[in-house]
Amino acid sequence: MNQDIYTYLHQLQQALQTQQAAILNLEDQVRQLQEELNELKNRPSSSVGKVEYKFDQLKVENLNGTLNIGLNPFSAKGQQIEDLQVDTETLKVNPETETNPDFYQGILQEMHRYLDEEAYNRILHFEQEERTPLDEMYRQMMVDDIKKQMEHRLPYYLSQAQSYEGISTDPDYLRDIIIQAMKQDIDKAFLSFIQHIPGNFRKE
């Protein structure tokens, strides 16, 4: 009987010691958490706030003083296609070309093809060139923003196309010049966007 009592008391003592050790361990953890909490409370507060991305916030000033992001049209001085040596006289286009839906549709199809198949690599190229990596979300936003402007900008490009010998009677030549100008301006818009994007929008 005495042996049984001794064994029971010994086991009880071991259980109490185990519980006491567990309690001490928990107290240490609580103390550590309390210290960390106090440290966080004593740190200077910094509020980032809600970050919203809007292309309008990233507009840059163009040559004539207006704000523009996305697709930069010809400037008033026609400097967007310098390699084509375009002067400032407005082209008198053939009315049939100006109102022909197939003419407009052909240009729009080519520009959408460019945006779908080539624009992404152009953006990556400019990111590497400027050492400014972007998240995928912003790349897609750039392309989508340009797409939304295509149809509305096309008449402006047509009106700003400049006089070349034979261009007013050659719709294919006019089409090629407009497409070249639009592609060049799209690339300039991508580059300008990347150069002016705030640091907190850049990919870490």
From Swiss-Prot:
<keyword id="KW-0749">Sporulation</keyword>
<protein>
    <recommendedName>
        <fullName>Probable spore germination protein GerPC</fullName>
    </recommendedName>
</protein>
<dbReference type="Pfam" id="PF10737">
    <property type="entry name" value="GerPC"/>
</dbReference>
<dbReference type="InterPro" id="IPR019673">
    <property type="entry name" value="Spore_germination_GerPC"/>
</dbReference>
<comment type="function">
    <text>Required for the formation of functionally normal spores. Could be involved in the establishment of normal spore coat structure and/or permeability, which allows the access of germinants to their receptor.</text>
</comment>
<dbReference type="GO" id="GO:0030435">
    <property type="term" value="P:sporulation resulting in formation of a cellular spore"/>
</dbReference>
<keyword id="KW-0309">Germination</keyword>
